[in-house]
Amino acid sequence: MVKVIASSVRKGNVLDVDGKLYVVLTAQNFHPGKGTPVTQVDMRRISDGVKVSERYRTTEQVERAFVEDREHTFLYEDGEGFHFMNPETYDQLVMSTEDIGDLKAYLQEGMAVMLSIHEGLAIAIDLPRHVTLEIVETEPVVKGQTASSSYKPAVLSNGVRTLVPPHIQAGTRVVIATEDGSYVERAKD
């Protein structure tokens, strides 16, 4: 365990609070007009998935757990969970649907991901920044509709809804940001 000041805590860090491990979901520093600056940390307990919100003084010490980030390949999903393999050792790890969360929509078989591993257990996942998906449904272009927003709703092959430029049609492959599901560009393949 490493002691760090609360203001240096970032999303994805693993903290040890009272002997229990928590994954940081969000960490924001606030400087109120009066009083001492504080860091608001929203976390998820790894053991049971309970979400907790804590407020620390920015100079307060918190314990960050030692976590090893290793590249793994996503294999498949079944009733047990999501299966990943270390390409160097061929060891397999399983993560639950709760641990993956909303990111499961962007997982593709054979995709290289970074897993955060603590004492042999995968506790967090980091996907590539962008994935390429196909548009399966979108509205037709209405000519002369320049006064309103220049984006239109579309449904991706993974079922996620996003906004795309008017020139994108169903069947077009596009690059999507995994962080927020937003359109990046048309795929170059």
UniProtKB/Swiss-Prot annotation:
Presence of keyword Metal-binding: no
User: What GO MF annotations does this protein's record show?
Assistant: translation elongation factor activity
* Chief place where the protein resides: cytoplasm
Q: Which GO terms describe its biological process?
A: peptide biosynthetic process
Q: What are the annotated GO cellular component locations? A: cytoplasm
The pathway where this protein functions is: Protein biosynthesis; polypeptide chain elongation
Instruction: Tell me the keywords, alphabetical order.
Output: Cytoplasm, Elongation factor, Protein biosynthesis
- Which CDD domains does the entry mention? S1_EF-P_repeat_1, S1_EF-P_repeat_2
PROSITE patterns on file? EFP
Where found? Cytoplasm
Its biological function? Involved in peptide bond synthesis. Stimulates efficient translation and peptide-bond synthesis on native or reconstituted 70S ribosomes in vitro. Probably functions indirectly by altering the affinity of the ribosome for aminoacyl-tRNA, thus increasing their reactivity as acceptors for peptidyl transferase.
Family as reported in the entry's similarity comment = Belongs to the elongation factor P family.
Q: Which NCBIfam families match?
A: efp (TIGR00038), PRK00529.1 (NF001810)
Q: What is this protein called?
A: Elongation factor P
| Gene, per the UniProt record | efp
